[in-house]
Regions:
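Detector for C-terminal structural segments
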Residues: 1, 68-76, 81, 103-138, ...
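Aromatic-rich, solvent-exposed beta-strand/loop patch
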Residues: 1-31, 57-75, 117, 159-164, ...
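Loop/turn elements at helix/coil->beta-strand transitions in domains of secreted/extracellular proteins
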Residues: 19, 40-42, 62-65, 95-99, ...
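Extracellular/periplasmic solute-recognition and catalytic clefts
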Residues: 24-86, 109-114, 228, 232-234, ...
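Short, hydrophobic alpha-helical packing/hinge segments within bilobed ligand-binding/sensory domains
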Residues: 32-33, 98-99, 217-221
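A short alpha-helix/helix-coil micro-patch that ends at or immediately precedes a cysteine
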Residues: 37, 196-203
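Short, well-structured beta-strand/strand-turn elements
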Residues: 44-46, 161-165, 201-216
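Primarily short, surface-exposed interaction patches in extracytoplasmic proteins
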Residues: 45, 89-94
Length: 362
């Protein structure tokens, strides 16, 4: 117990019952899963994703641990670097038709069946999660249909042609295009990234997939070096009411999914640095500020919320893939462990479940 901690239990015993916590860092997903199968951890939820569930479920009895599959608040989503230092890429990534093409080029049903075992829901990214009642359900399915024909037509319109006959499209300026898909398994499952990369290659967009550490990913993302951002995003209404980050460049903090870094510079410097964002970005900033100061449940509040979602969804700065459950792991010797309602950072993971009252029985 910690004598300086501010909570005691109902009998007056000082909390927490467990006086020390050690965290083992295992970046490689296979190593991480092996450690869990061998019961080398007492609790784990962060970085666990549904594609790893079968091996964890299969070894529960042998490892004397329990897996609960709980719904996620966030969802896998992808962004393009609309302020890329490569001006040829910046022009293409900033073209809404390109982002529309990349959205409909994804076979979300197949991704759900293969990577999520049919347990997820193909869905567009709305920023809000779960979807509030004042937001039209139609936005959840906006541009998520699998339509490679439409993707090819849009890419043709932009002027992205295969000029050298290698099966992949060049940029409109004639330069070769390779989209570097760096990802961390803390943010998105490798199977999802590989399948999305394959889908894009099928409409002539060459990709290179590489797994990196979370630190490498975040550093590259915040220094405007990524071609593509890939992480999990989404917040409940209650959080959005006090936190505007999903609607203001760069659309999340250092540890989340950021895009439009030079737009953020422009906004933060009042236009003295960075790149001026499009009008819809400024509109979103104005709307979230008014939304947060408007009476909850009023007609104006709901009008603003719907408009924010429409603006977010139709501009596809973050493109949703699939939302599904994820594993929560605990060793059976860890007692007072109640089943989580959600798998989420947004509710501070263990905080609602009184982790201070967990104890060991062994």
């Amino acid at each position: 117990a910690n004598p300086y901690f501010h909570i005691v239990d109902t009998q007056g015993n000082q909390l927490p019952y467990i006086s020390e916590q050690d965290e083992i860092y295992a970046n490689d997903n296979e190593v991480r899963i092996l450690k869990l199968v061998n019961a080398e951890a007492d609790y784990k939820s962060q970085s666990l994703q549904l594609p790893s569930a079968p091996i964890l479920l299969e070894n529960q009895q042998k490892g004397d641990y329990t897996i609960h599959l709980r719904p996620e608040i966030t969802m896998a989503n992808i962004s393009f670097n609309v302020t890329s230092a490569d001006l040829g890429k910046r022009k293409v990534f900033g073209d809404l038709r390109f982002r529309q093409a990349m959205s409909v080029a994804m076979n979300r049903e197949e991704i759900n069946e293969v990577a999520f075992f049919g347990q997820g829901t193909p869905k567009q990214y709305l920023a809000f999660s779960p979807t509030p009642g004042f937001v039209g359900k139609k936005w959840e399915t906006y541009m998520i249909q699998y339509d490679p024909g439409m993707a090819n037509r849009l890419l043709d319109e932009i002027g992205m042609k295969d000029t050298d006959g290698d099966g992949f499209r060049e940029l409109p300026n004639g330069k070769k295009l390779v989209i570097n898909m760096q990802f961390s398994t803390q943010g998105i499952a490798g199977q999802v990234v590989e399948m999305v990369g394959q889908n894009w290659s099928e409409v002539g967009i060459k990709t290179a997939v590489k797994e990196v550490t979370p630190d490498e990913y975040r550093s590259a993302q915040s220094s405007n070096q990524l071609d593509v951002g890939m992480w999990r995003s989404g917040q409940p209404l209650a959080i959005v009411l006090g936190n505007n980050e999903l609607f203001v460049p760069p659309y999340e903090g250092y540890f989340g999914h950021r895009t439009g870094m030079l737009w953020a510079e422009y906004v933060d410097s009042n236009g003295s640095k960075g790149v001026k964002p499009p009008a819809y970005v400024i509109q979103l900033i104005e709307d979230i500020n008014e939304f947060q100061s408007t009476k909850i449940g009023s007609p104006r509040f709901e009008e603003l919320g719907e408009r924010m979602v429409k603006n977010t969804v139709t501009n596809l700065l973050k493109i949703g893939v699939v939302q599904g459950p994820a594993p929560v792991y605990h060793r059976n010797a860890l007692k007072n462990f109640v089943e989580f309602k959600t798998h989420s950072y947004e509710y501070y993971r263990t905080y609602p479940y009184r982790g201070t009252q967990w104890y060991f029985d062994e």
